[in-house]
């Protein structure tokens, strides 16, 4: 094999109750690692790329094989250490310790940039883990659908009296994360025009029912949008094109969407963003032969792209950055007012973070969709008054196609996550579920990320860049007994702009699991409430008091 990162084999997670490892605590990370590379889940699985430009699950195929072999042989009192996608050690710990500890793409701050990372990457010394790619808890595009839905719903509340019927959203990017936008828009009641340069990605979203139609010309796409909005229908179209060309053209034509955003992979100027005027084939070739030229051309195109977004904003169109760092690139390229429009977290999501509410998710290791439907019902039973959440679960069941192992995303917060975890564990114990479930979250959560251009943008106390919080979150989840814990750098917004942590815990129906679940699923969201209370948010302070958190330096208790 000439390229250690390319292999033609297909990987799929085992299903059912037969173990391939020594216990469910090691079977769980094994299955979720393999699930990340399922052809129905990953963007470029043969290259180990899960999503987000070059977000990988393992450094090389040899490393993947070594991780799999080690997990199969790992004892219940041992912990596997994974350094940027490479299994570097196994150490004796104890039964309540994590079975896997992962660190991906972390660099000393002075060297935390794409140029230095790319040098290490070429030498085989590093791997970009994105957020859930290298931490083995990616569940396909569903993983971001509800967060995007919540954002669009809140935008509708703020700007259109809570009604997006007859409205349409303009966006770019239909990759693993951006692909959620059309479906989220439709669920929120709006139409969506999503610009994507790679036709295979549009076809992937059509196949998985995340987008309703495909267009090859702007006129064709606008005709569909006009037809649907006039009829009051909520539908979406993926337009084959370049956002850096389409956005300015729409503005020049006098077309005014009702909401404008973008989720191209602008965080990675080489692998994530097609320069204006280039073909996809030319772009792919020059990524290898002349990456600096690609980056320069992409950055120049991003400046044009963001200028169009600023123009829409100045024209009165609600416009939001969706966390890909495109404003920062445009500013670095000389666009002084690139940050004229806000990021989605300070504009719409932060009140949820203040209560520890974020992208809680779980996957059925059995592979049986019925296990997810049963847990959906359990969520409704335990949270009977949360009709907004019930509506989400109903829409998710109807509209979201499972990718790989069946899974569910469900935004809940402190006080509810541990109750759900314990209930799922009991369902495994009594046989309601056919096999254990794993419970995790995105790194995009209330207490697990420092990202000044995204999750921690415009913090009330100016603590946007303080990254103690995700480090403490990872340490606390390790001490609390999560099944695997990860600490990453650069996810979402690229090298030098974020640090973040993840956790996953397996509910196998045992008493030991119940104790760990109660600790982890309380402590993890509690760190988010703590972080926001420390920053001076009244909602977080009130939540901390209601939940009885002991925060001596914040509450004085």
From Swiss-Prot:
UniProt keyword Transcription, yes or no: no
One Gene Ontology term, aspect cellular component: cytoplasm
Catalysis: reaction(s): 4-imidazolone-5-propanoate = trans-urocanate + H2O
A GO BP entry: L-histidine catabolic process to glutamate and formate
Superkingdom, taxonomy of origin: Bacteria
Cofactor binding notes: Binds 1 NAD(+) per subunit.
Task performed by this protein: Catalyzes the conversion of urocanate to 4-imidazolone-5-propionate.
Name of this chain's protein: Urocanate hydratase
Organism this protein belongs to: Agrobacterium fabrum (strain C58 / ATCC 33970)
Upper taxonomic lineage: Bacteria, Pseudomonadati, Pseudomonadota, Alphaproteobacteria, Hyphomicrobiales
């Amino acid at each position: 094999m000439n390229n250690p990162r390319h292999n033609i084999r297909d990987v799929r997670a085992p299903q059912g109750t037969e173990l391939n490892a020594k216990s469910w605590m090691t079977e769980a990370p094994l299955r979720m690692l393999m699930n990340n590379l399922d052809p129905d889940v990953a963007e470029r699985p043969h290259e180990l790329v899960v999503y987000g430009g070059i977000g990988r699950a393992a450094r090389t195929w040899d490393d993947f094989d070594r991780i799999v072999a080690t997990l199969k042989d790992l004892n219940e009192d041992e912990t596997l250490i994974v350094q940027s996608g490479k299994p570097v050690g196994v150490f004796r710990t104890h039964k309540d310790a994590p079975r896997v500890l992962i660190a991906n793409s972390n660099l000393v701050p002075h060297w935390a940039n794409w140029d230095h990372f790319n040098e290490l990457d070429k030498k085989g010394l590093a791997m970009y883990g994105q957020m859930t790619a290298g931490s083995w808890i990616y569940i396909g595009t569903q993983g971001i659908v509800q967060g995007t839905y919540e954002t669009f719903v809140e935008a509708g509340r703020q700007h259109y009296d809570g009604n997006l019927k007859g409205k349409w959203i303009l966006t770019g990017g239909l990759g693993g994360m951006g692909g959620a936008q059309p479906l989220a828009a439709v669920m929120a009641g709006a139409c969506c025009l999503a610009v994507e340069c790679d036709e295979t990605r549009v076809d992937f979203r059509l196949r998985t029912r995340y987008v309703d139609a495909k267009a090859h010309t702007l006129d064709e796409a606008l005709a569909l949008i006009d037809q649907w909005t006039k009829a009051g229908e909520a539908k979406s179209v993926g337009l084959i094109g370049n956002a850096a060309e389409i956005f300015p053209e729409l503005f020049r034509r006098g077309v005014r969407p009702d909401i404008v955003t973008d989720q191209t992979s602008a965080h990675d100027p080489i692998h994530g963003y097609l320069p204006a005027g280039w073909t996809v084939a030319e772009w792919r070739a020059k990524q290898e032969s002349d990456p600096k030229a690609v980056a320069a051309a992409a950055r120049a195109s991003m400046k044009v792209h963001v200028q169009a977004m600023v123009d829409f904003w100045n024209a009165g169109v609600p416009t939001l950055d969706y966390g890909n760092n495109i404003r920062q690139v445009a500013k670095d390229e000389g666009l002084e007012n690139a940050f004229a429009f806000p990021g989605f977290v300070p504009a719409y999501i932060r009140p949820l973070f203040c209560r520890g509410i974020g992208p809680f998710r779980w996957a059925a290791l059995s592979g049986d969709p019925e296990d997810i439907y049963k847990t959906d019902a359990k969520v409704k039973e335990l949270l009977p008054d949360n009709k907004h959440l019930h509506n989400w679960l109903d829409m998710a069941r109807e509209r979201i196609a499972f990718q790989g192992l069946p899974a569910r995303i469900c935004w809940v917060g402190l006080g509810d996550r541990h109750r759900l975890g314990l209930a799922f564990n009991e369902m495994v114990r009594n046989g309601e579920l056919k096999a254990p479930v794993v419970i995790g979250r995105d790194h995009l959560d209330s207490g697990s990320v420092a990202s000044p251009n995204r999750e921690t943008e415009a913090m009330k106390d100016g603590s946007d860049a303080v990254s103690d919080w995700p480090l403490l979150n990872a340490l606390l989840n390790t001490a609390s007994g999560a099944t695997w814990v990860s600490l990453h750098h650069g996810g979402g917004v690229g090298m030098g702009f974020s640090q973040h942590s993840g956790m996953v815990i397996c509910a196998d129906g045992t008493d030991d699991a119940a104790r760990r679940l109660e600790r982890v699923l309380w402590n993890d969201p509690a760190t988010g409430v703590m972080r926001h209370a420390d920053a001076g948010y009244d909602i977080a302070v009130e939540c901390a008091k209601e939940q009885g958190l002991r925060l001596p330096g914040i509450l004085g208790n």
